[in-house]
């Protein structure tokens, strides 16, 4: 075959290839313009979801008894309805509205139940879709609105610093337990942050090899966590967190209520916390004796270590009641993790206080 024939064949093949490529491109462009991507709409039948939820837990002859309600909602029904009522009154998001077609939207019960289920079980956002009939993005929005407004409505009451009356009650409890002047136990816990941004992992990763966020808390015997400092990187130890913590701000700025108590005939005017051995030897921290010598020292070490476990018990209850704290944090936003943690603390003490009030009335 001559060179001229070969050149003609190559040119012809190139023309055919160019034509095929141009036709393929035009077909793709035309199909894209003719078939725009639309948002997938799923008819979830919201009314059926509300009716099922109402019949299961809230009607007069509900399917599930009160003990199962408390186990699944982590609180009794009266308290849950109180929260739903407050949110419905003060937050427009939790009020039931109608969509553009006039159909009723999600009820306050559905929205609050979705948020509580995520907090209680630490499950994925779409895990409640089949039962409550709301989508993943709506469930996450319910969770964030719930945590944000629980803190706004109840935080000042249940996450506040102790008033003079509260402080006197804590001092009385401490004296009964053999520690006059004690107002609580202080310690830290680490919450794994699964979706920590890659650029931050070095700052938040400690010896376990996983990034964590630190919660510093002061807890009393009745599990009241009246001081919570959350958000420090996991590489910090308890002393580093204490350096950043506002736990002593009221004392330094002269806003703390005055305290007076007597031990062995000596009067003191500064309350203290029970701690483990890592904390500095300040007058506001009382630690155990690592190597007690003699019966008195052994008795003191035994009582101090037992009483100090109040804060560890509070951490255990926190993780047992709300698995979202026990499981790794899935959000990319540390602020939202902070709101989830703070809301959980508020909800736990709110439920505990209501239960204690109910026991007193009985």
Protein language model regions, located:
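Short, polybasic Lys/Arg-rich linear motifs in disordered N-terminal/cytosolic regions
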Residues: 1-362
């Amino acid at each position: 075959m001559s060179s001229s024939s070969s050149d003609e064949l190559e040119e012809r093949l190139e023309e055919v290839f160019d034509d095929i490529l141009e036709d393929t491109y035009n077909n793709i462009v035309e199909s894209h313009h003719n078939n725009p991507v639309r948002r997938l709409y799923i008819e979830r039948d919201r009314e059926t979801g509300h009716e099922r939820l109402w019949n299961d837990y809230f009607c007069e002859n509900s399917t599930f008894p009160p003990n199962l309600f408390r186990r699944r909602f982590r609180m009794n029904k009266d308290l849950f309805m109180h929260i739903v009522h407050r949110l419905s009154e003060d937050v427009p998001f939790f009020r039931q509205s109608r969509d553009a077609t006039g159909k009723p939207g999600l009820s306050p019960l559905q929205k609050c139940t979705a948020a509580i289920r995520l907090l209680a079980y630490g499950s994925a956002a779409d895990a409640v879709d089949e039962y409550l009939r709301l989508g993943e993005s709506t469930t996450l929005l319910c969770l964030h609105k719930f945590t944000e407004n629980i803190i706004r409505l109840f935080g000042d009451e249940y996450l506040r610093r102790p008033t003079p009356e509260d402080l006197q009650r804590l001092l009385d409890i401490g004296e009964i337990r053999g520690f006059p002047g004690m107002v609580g136990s202080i310690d830290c816990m680490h919450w794994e942050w699964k979706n920590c941004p890659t650029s931050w992992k070095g700052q938040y990763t400690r010896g376990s090899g996983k990034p964590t966020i630190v919660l510093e808390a002061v807890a009393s015997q009745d599990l009241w966590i009246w001081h919570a400092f959350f958000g420090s990187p996991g590489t910090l130890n308890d002393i580093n967190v204490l350096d950043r913590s506002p736990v002593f701000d009221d004392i330094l700025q002269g806003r703390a209520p005055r305290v007076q108590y007597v031990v062995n005939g000596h009067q003191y005017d500064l309350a203290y916390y029970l701690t483990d051995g890592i904390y500095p030897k300040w007058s506001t921290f009382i630690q155990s004796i690592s190597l007690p010598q003699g019966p008195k020292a052994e008795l003191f070490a035994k009582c101090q270590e037992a009483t100090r476990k109040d804060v560890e018990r509070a951490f255990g209850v926190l993780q047992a009641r709300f698995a979202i704290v026990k499981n790794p944090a899935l959000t990319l936003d540390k602020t939202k993790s902070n709101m989830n943690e703070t809301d959980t603390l508020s909800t736990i003490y709110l439920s505990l206080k209501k239960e204690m009030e109910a026991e007193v009335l009985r």
